[in-house]
């Protein structure tokens, strides 16, 4: 009887253990543009986030995104598209950002980056990040038309307006200089 | 012998009544309904899929389970294929449920379409984001996230990756139009109050000034600027009433005469 009770207790404890057992490292990888607009020949910032949601550290983590930004259509201004982290502890996260510069305008499909990591030095895992999807790379001129400071426009505007403002002011000055005495008399 | 036959007859009669009851057909068809419900519940998780869920924004939502209205809520779903066949992650559906009754939907969000193929021994991360509307501010709701996926044979699976009650808080960090307009209203009210009080005070002071003047007033004859009055008019006046003193004074002068 006692033995059977113990056996039952053991079964119950092992069931609980299954419910709360520690999970291996599980990395969620996140790729996200931080710039609102992608414009040709202007900086574009990308951020990669790695979140270890498992209960054990992930070893030898790499991010590889070289294939999604071919160098014939993108300049890499700052940062690396292939990064290596020795370890990401459980429950912590890493962010990595890269500044690139598109060389041409048009639609571009932002694909997933590849992340690899090891759990227990043995199990090799391959993870693909989310895909930001298709985005439009603006033409420089289009972007300037909407957002650049319009100094030349103002200059041209002032030149056009000059005959009616500056011209009339000069005429007024001339006529005023013609009657200096009359004005003095009135004021006294 | 007689007693036994009576018992037998009674038993027969009872059976007949019971049978009649059954024939009446009052027993409803419960059984098929139950089986249908069972069929619905058979769409479950696949043993070869491992899923994970993590809030990215706000970053403390994983622990405290709180959102702010009007600010983006972003989360990641990890999908791990532990089996030997491909999986296709079709979509994830997010919904707010009534906290005490999760079968009651408060809001269904646009489902995130992914259609991502996950090869064996591979993992994929999916992202989704939404805004909690202001009307949910200050109350708990049940957030439910289900992931729908298919295996290579076309079997459909559904995994529940998040099913918790979360608190939605009002965002009071930034400028809110309501308090801003309240402030402007109070400023306007105080300016109006100042104006009214100023008006009232000036009225009071003017009254006192008038009464004083009434006592002191003695006519304006001495201060008349005669340059402004035509000559003949002044002469006429002098002819008609040479005396500039008051009638009382005149009377007293006559008496004296």
Swiss-Prot record, chain A:
Query: Which InterPro entries does the record associate with it?
Result: TRAP_beta (IPR008856)
Question: Quick one: signal sequence residues?
Answer: 1-15
Q: How does it assemble?
A: Heterotetramer of TRAP-alpha, TRAP-beta, TRAP-delta and TRAP-gamma.
Which keywords does this chain's UniProt record carry? Endoplasmic reticulum, Glycoprotein, Membrane, Signal, Transmembrane, Transmembrane helix
Compartmental location: Endoplasmic reticulum membrane
What gene is this protein a product of?
A: trap-2
Query: In this entry, which stretches build a coiled coil?
Result: none
Coarse class of the primary localization is endoplasmic reticulum
- Keyword S-adenosyl-L-methionine included in the entry's annotation: no
This chain belongs to the protein called Translocon-associated protein subunit beta
Database matches in Pfam families: TRAP_beta (PF05753)
Q: What does this protein do?
A: TRAP proteins are part of a complex whose function is to bind calcium to the ER membrane and thereby regulate the retention of ER resident proteins.
What's an example GO cellular component term for this entry?
endoplasmic reticulum membrane
Asked if the Swiss-Prot or TrEMBL record annotates the protein with the keyword Transmembrane, the reply is yes
Residues passing through the membrane, by range:
152-172
Which sequence ranges are listed under topological domain Lumenal? Answer: 16-151
């Amino acid at each position: 009887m006692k033995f059977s009770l113990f056996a039952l207790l053991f079964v119950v404890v092992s069931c609980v253990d299954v419910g709360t057992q520690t999970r291996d490292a599980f990395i969620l990888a996140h790729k996200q543009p931080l710039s609102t607009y992608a414009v040709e020949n202007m900086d574009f910032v990308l951020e990669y986030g790695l979140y270890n949601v498992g209960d054990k550290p992930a070893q030898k983590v790499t991010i590889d995104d070289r294939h999604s930004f071919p160098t014939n259509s993108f300049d890499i201004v700052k940062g690396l598209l292939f990064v290596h982290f020795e370890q990401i502890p459980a429950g912590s996260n890493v962010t990595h950002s890269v500044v690139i510069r598109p060389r041409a305008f048009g639609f571009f499909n932002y694909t997933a980056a590849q992340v690899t990591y090891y759990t227990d030095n043995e199990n090799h895992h391959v993870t693909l990040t989310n895909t930001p999807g298709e985005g439009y790379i603006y033409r420089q001129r289009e972007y300037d038309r909407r957002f650049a400071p319009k100094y030349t426009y103002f200059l041209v505007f002032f030149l056009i307006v000059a005959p009616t403002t500056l011209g009339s002011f000069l005429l007024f000055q001339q006529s005023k200089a013609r009657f200096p005495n009359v004005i003095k008399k009135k004021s006294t | 012998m007689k007693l036994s036959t009576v018992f037998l007859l009674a038993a027969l009669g009872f059976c007949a009544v019971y049978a009649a009851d059954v024939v009446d057909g009052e027993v409803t068809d419960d059984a098929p309904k139950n089986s249908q419900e069972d069929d619905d519940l058979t769409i479950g998780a696949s043993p070869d899929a491992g899923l994970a869920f993590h809030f990215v924004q706000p970053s403390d939502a994983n622990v405290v389970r709180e959102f702010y209205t009007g600010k983006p809520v972003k989360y990641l779903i990890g999908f791990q294929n532990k089996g030997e066949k491909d999986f296709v992650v079709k979509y994830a559906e997010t919904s707010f449920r009534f906290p005490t009754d999760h079968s009651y939907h408060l809001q269904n969000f646009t489902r995130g379409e992914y259609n991502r193929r996950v090869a064996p021994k591979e993992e994929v991360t999916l992202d989704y984001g939404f805004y909690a509307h202001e009307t949910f501010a200050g109350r708990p709701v049940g957030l439910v996230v289900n992931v729908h996926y298919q295996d290579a044979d076309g079997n459909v699976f559904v995994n529940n990756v998040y099913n918790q009650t979360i608190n939605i808080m009002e965002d009071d960090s930034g400028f809110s139009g309501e308090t801003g307009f309240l402030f402007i209203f109070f400023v306007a009210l105080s300016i109006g109050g100042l104006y009214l009080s100023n008006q009232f005070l000036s009225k009071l002071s003017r009254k006192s000034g008038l009464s004083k003047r009434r006592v002191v007033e003695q006519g304006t004859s001495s201060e008349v600027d005669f340059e402004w009055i035509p000559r003949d008019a002044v002469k006429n006046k002098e002819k008609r009433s040479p005396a500039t003193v008051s009638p009382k004074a005149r009377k007293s002068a006559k008496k004296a005469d």
